[in-house]
Amino acid sequence: MQALRRKDVDARLVVFERYQLHPEADWSLDRPSGLAARQLAQWRAFAKLAPRTDVFHFYFGLTLVPKSLQFPLLRALGKKSVMHFLGSDIRGKSPHELEWAQRAGARIVGSYDAARWVPDAEVIPPGIDLSEIDPVPPADRERPVVLHAPSSRRRKGTEAVIAACAQLDVELQIVEGLDHRKAFELYRTADIVVDQLNAGWYGVFAIEAMALGKPVVTFLHDEAVRRTQEAFGVEVPILSATHETLVERLRPLVESPEERGRLGAVSRAYVEHVHDADVIADRLLDLYARLS
């Protein structure tokens, strides 16, 4: 949102509930309990926003009013619309289950891995504000800190991370249950970051780690890597690993402070090229301009 505002766009963030993830939201509906009361609150919000909004950019498969009505209503009102999928909201779903999104003016996914489920979507990676993140290169120490921050141990493959680190001379730090500010301070102390071992692509946690200049290990689908490198003209610096190969992928980083530093620097440069919020804002504005 801040990157759009820096480009003189009157952008507002509206959420259903504020939670810890979006303390910066301009408006939280703080929806009441009960389906009918929630629907009424959302209809009222839509009625308030419609006259003053040119582009409705929805996230995570959520809309203000029922999906069957949301996009036809916006089109009738002469408003532009975008449905921005984040990954877990589409992963494994059939084309029929996602057919409703074809009514939006455009669809966005954050990676070429997610494009498997929405082939006609624009691929616009997540952006972060790099002006607020100074690199903290990995430390030159014999026993490096491996950091892992699972939102779900099962989905992220945490038990395999624990088992792999037990075979290496490292200090494993698992970050859980903290607000983002406190968690981010711990990210700064890492020498190596392990994201996840199941999903096939990386998320915001890995992007933040790379922005800090940390080498990142996670599981990546080969085809998504190829398409990403073709689209952006830069090599994806993340080391891909599975449950079975994690130890061998970590070992060179554990044994070589120089390799940790080299890969960390390359990772920061990659984020500057692919994930800078100002670059992403320009891509969004280009998409908005092309909507009918």
Question: Which stretches of residues belong to each language-model region?
Answer:
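Active-site proximal beta-strand in glycosyltransferases
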Residues: 14, 55-60, 71-91, 106-109
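A charged, aromatic-enriched C-terminal amphipathic alpha-helix characteristic of glycosyltransferases
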Residues: 255-288
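Short hydrophobic beta-strand element within catalytic cores of glycosyltransferases
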Residues: 215-224
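Donor nucleotide-sugar binding/catalytic pocket of nucleotide-sugar-dependent glycosyltransferases
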Residues: 89-90, 102-135, 141
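Short N-terminal targeting/anchoring amphipathic segment
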Residues: 46-66, 82, 192, 196
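Acidic donor-binding loop of glycosyltransferase active sites
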Residues: 188-201, 214
